[in-house]
Amino acid sequence: MDLKKLEGIFEGMLFASGDKVSIEKLSSITGIDKKTVKLVINNMIVKYNNDPSRGITIREINNGYQLCSKPEYYDYIKQLFEPKQRSGLSQAALETLAIIAYNRPITKAKIEQIRGVNSDSAITKLLEKNLIREAGRLDAPGKPVLYETTDEFFRSFGFKSDADLPIFELNDIHETVEINQNSEQEKADTELEKQEKA
């Protein structure tokens, strides 16, 4: 098949999808092997990124591709949409998300064992934001739910796959959680002292 036609097919499929399309899907629909799919799309990415007249690019996300607007045009593109109230993630939610990202799939009990505190609220928030999802149940008493990160997580944080996650040891996460817990305790103690003096 002609290369330009193949690029047009991939571009049309990614545009129509509006979401990530897996390499397997692109390969099975076009009848082109996965290696060639990757080569063609990586070539398209280079073309898009080197052409300032193009407002779009293709992002690789977790063994798939998505057609996206270029980040440098964000200030213009955001004006097309109604302003939305977007609340950031709390420290607790970020800790929980990091634990899930590095240990997926993982149960709530294990998350709470690592954090040392209840994580219901953080997990609910992450589910609402589609950064994590249920990934089945552990084959253990009570059949606890397992959690894992989603494609939205990779998209939001700019990672292609697990291989792009910064390298941390579980001990680093434990230390960060402990530091944050100590910091919260210090804030609470300071506030209590102020109230006692007043």
UniProtKB/Swiss-Prot annotation:
GO CC terms, sorted: cytoplasm
Record-linked InterPro entries: ScpB_csome_segregation, WH-like_DNA-bd_sf, WH_DNA-bd_sf
Subcellular locations according to the entry: Cytoplasm
Top-level taxon of the source organism: Bacteria
GO BP terms in the entry: cell division; chromosome separation; DNA replication
Key words of the record: Cell cycle, Cell division, Chromosome partition, Cytoplasm
Main localization (coarse): cytoplasm
Keyword Amino-acid biosynthesis included in the entry's annotation: no
Database matches in SUPFAM superfamilies: Winged helix' DNA-binding domain (SSF46785)
Pfam families reported in the protein's UniProt record: SMC_ScpB
Quaternary data: Homodimer. Homodimerization may be required to stabilize the binding of ScpA to the Smc head domains. Component of a cohesin-like complex composed of ScpA, ScpB and the Smc homodimer, in which ScpA and ScpB bind to the head domain of Smc. The presence of the three proteins is required for the association of the complex with DNA.
PANTHER family, per the entry: SEGREGATION AND CONDENSATION PROTEIN B
HAMAP family, A to Z: ScpB (MF_01804)
Family membership: Belongs to the ScpB family.
Functional description taken from the UniProt entry: Participates in chromosomal partition during cell division. May act via the formation of a condensin-like complex containing Smc and ScpA that pull DNA away from mid-cell into both cell halves.
Protein name in UniProt: Segregation and condensation protein B
Native species: Acetivibrio thermocellus (strain ATCC 27405 / DSM 1237 / JCM 9322 / NBRC 103400 / NCIMB 10682 / NRRL B-4536 / VPI 7372)
Gene coding for it: scpB
